[in-house]
Curated annotation (Swiss-Prot):
InterPro entries: Ribosomal_uS7, Ribosomal_uS7_bac/org-type, Ribosomal_uS7_CS, Ribosomal_uS7_dom, Ribosomal_uS7_dom_sf. Belongs to the universal ribosomal protein uS7 family. The gene is rpsG. This is Small ribosomal subunit protein uS7. GO terms for biological process: translation. One of its GO terms (cellular component) is small ribosomal subunit. PROSITE patterns: RIBOSOMAL_S7 (PS00052). The keyword rRNA-binding applies. The lineage of its organism: Bacteria, Pseudomonadati, Pseudomonadota, Gammaproteobacteria, Alteromonadales. It comes from Shewanella amazonensis (strain ATCC BAA-1098 / SB2B). One of its GO terms (molecular function) is structural constituent of ribosome. One of the primary rRNA binding proteins, it binds directly to 16S rRNA where it nucleates assembly of the head domain of the 30S subunit. Is located at the subunit interface close to the decoding center, probably blocks exit of the E-site tRNA. Gene3D superfamilies: Ribosomal protein S7 domain. Keywords: Ribonucleoprotein, Ribosomal protein, RNA-binding, rRNA-binding, tRNA-binding.
Length: 156
């Protein structure tokens, strides 16, 4: 085991507009090439579109969308005696959030709307209604874990 102290997770500053750490993380996931101001514009525009269409608070819809995309179990590859098994494991809360945000952004990028803000808004609305590509990704991961339940005793 290493003798050095374990490095803790960095504190993230909440975003300036809504004062939310979750939103600040989401902005960082959207950001490309260090262009944070562009990422902020995309997120805020998407949240405005969502609030306009849903008639609910911005962050409530975002939280609902992320709740419907968060995975509870995933599979990890484990090599046992020459063969590799897909072992189902529970997902830590921090990783759940990270995966949900990543899947939501990936699904939004694959959509067909004109701007990224509209794509993200559409995917958030779909995810909050429990449909869409990001939710399908979560269902696939859960299905994979369910199919490999027999190897759960290899967990570490």
């Amino acid at each position: 085991m290493p003798r050095r102290r374990v490095v803790g997770q960095r504190k993230i500053l909440p975003d300036p507009k809504f004062n939310s750490e979750l939103l600040a993380k989401f902005i960082n996931v959207i950001m490309q090439d260090g262009k944070k101001s562009v990422a902020e514009k995309i997120i805020y525009k998407a949240l405005d579109v969502v609030a306009e269409k849903k008639g609910e608070d911005h962050l409530v819809v975002l939280e609902a969308a992320l709740d419907n995309v968060r995975p509870s179990v995933e599979v990890k590859s484990r090599r046992v005696g020459g063969s590799t098994y897909q072992v189902p494991c529970e997902v830590r809360p921090v990783r759940r959030n990270a995966l949900a945000m990543r899947w939501l952004v990936e699904a939004a990028r694959k959509r067909g709307e004109k701007s990224m803000a509209l794509r993200l808004a559409g995917e958030m609305l779909d995810a909050s209604d429990n449909k869409g590509t990001a939710v399908k990704k979560r269902e696939d991961v859960h299905r994979m874990a369910e199919a490999n339940k027999a190897f759960a005793h290899y967990r570490w």
